[in-house]
Each structure stands twice: as structure tokens, then as C-alpha cells.
């Protein structure tokens, strides 16, 4: 199934999309095409089981976060990667503008900023592959996922140990570029860090 770019839609159209897709999708468990999800999904109480496949990051702690600058911050319960994957349930409406915080086990001391997964690097289109070496060359990136209304979605991310500002750190990114929402943040050697929840622009 090909991945299509997602752009925010008018509220009424999105509401209709949420209802129609809910009736059509049933209990879909395959990897889903991300669809722009919105707060209107709250009205019908959709939930999504989000599975992240994370090789070579056993013991990494994953937290899903969502903040659009208007609604309260959403934070999932932190979950640990076991057997190369982790599954977290969250409201579908909060997948729009979702960011993923990664705390790798090799960071044994507290750091000033958290590592976030990059869904799209500048110059890459939805569906484009990007490896470690190319990711390390990038200077701008988005850590805001476009979201979904599917009941179950599986995404693949990669996490590698790197040096960041002379200290042990991590780079986390989607090896296949995913649907995203702004902003594009400045990154150093492909590493997206923040000292707070990423603010994602759903309404641009």
C-alpha cells in the first residue's frame, strides 16, 4: 500500500472522514496509511494501538506525546521496547501531531534534552527511504506525525548511539519517510532534541 502525503482539512470534512473510515476499517491490523486525525475523533472515542518496531534498541523507553498549542499536552505511560517492539494504546485524536520521545539505556546520566523520532527530514518526500549516513547529514526535520484513525498501526523507527555535543546521545528516525505536520525544526547532525514537548502545527 503506498503512502500518501497528508494535509490538514476543513473541520467538517475531517469529521465526515473520521466517521466513514471508522465504519470501513473495522479491526484493521496491517500497517496503515497515516491519515490526518483531529480532535473531532474524541466525539466517537476512537483508540489506536500504535506498534513501533525498534531494532537494536532493547530496553529503550518510549513515550508518545501530543501538543498542538491549543489543547492540553497528552503523554502516554512510558513503555519499554521488548523483543524489538513496543505497543502503546492512545486516543486516535491525539495521534495527529504526535511525537515520540526515546530514552535509550546507554544514557546512564540525566540529559538536558530528550531525543525525538524524526518522521521527515528536509528534502525527503513521503515514502522515501533514508539511511543512517544520510540522516546524519541533515539540518532540518519534523518530529510531528500526521496521525491516523485506524484501530491499529505499525511503524518502523531506527535508533542509533551517537555523540551529541561531545556526550553520549542518540539519533532516532523513520527509515521510510512518514506523513508529517509542521514545523521543520533545526537539527544537529540529524538529531532532533527538545527540552519540552514538541509543539506541532495542525492548523497551517
Language-model regions, residue ranges each:
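Beta-strand-rich domain onsets/edges
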Residues: 33-48, 198-204
Amino acid at each position: 500500500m503506498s503512502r500518501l502525503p497528508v494535509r490538514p482539512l476543513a473541520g467538517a470534512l475531517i469529521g465526515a472522514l473520521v466517521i466513514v473510515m471508522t465504519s470501513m476499517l473495522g479491526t484493521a491490523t496491517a500497517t496503515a496509511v497515516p491519515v490526518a486525525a483531529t480532535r473531532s475523533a474524541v466525539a466517537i472515542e476512537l483508540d489506536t494501538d500504535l506498534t513501533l518496531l525498534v531494532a537494536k534498541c532493547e530496553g529503550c523507553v518510549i513515550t508518545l506525546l501530543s501538543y498542538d498549542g491549543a489543547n492540553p499536552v497528552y503523554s502516554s505511560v512510558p513503555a519499554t521496547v521488548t523483543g524489538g517492539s513496543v505497543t502503546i494504546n492512545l486516543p486516535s485524536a491525539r495521534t495527529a501531531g504526535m511525537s515520540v520521545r526515546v530514552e535509550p539505556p546507554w544514557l546512564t546520566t540525566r540529559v538536558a534534552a530528550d531525543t525525538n523520532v524524526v518522521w521527515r527530514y528536509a528534502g525527503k518526500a513521503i515514502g522515501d527511504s533514508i539511511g543512517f549516513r544520510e540522516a546524519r547529514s541533515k539540518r532540518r526535520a519534523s518530529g510531528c506525525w500526521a496521525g491516523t484513525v485506524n484501530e491499529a498501526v505499525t511503524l518502523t523507527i531506527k535508533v542509533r548511539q551517537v555523540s551529541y555535543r561531545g556526550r553520549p546521545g542518540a539519533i532516532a528516525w523513520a527509515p521510510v519517510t512518514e506523513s508529517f505536520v509542521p514545523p521543520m525544526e533545526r537539527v544537529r547532525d540529524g538529531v532532533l532534541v527538545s527540552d519540552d514537548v514538541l509543539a506541532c502545527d495542525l492548523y497551517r
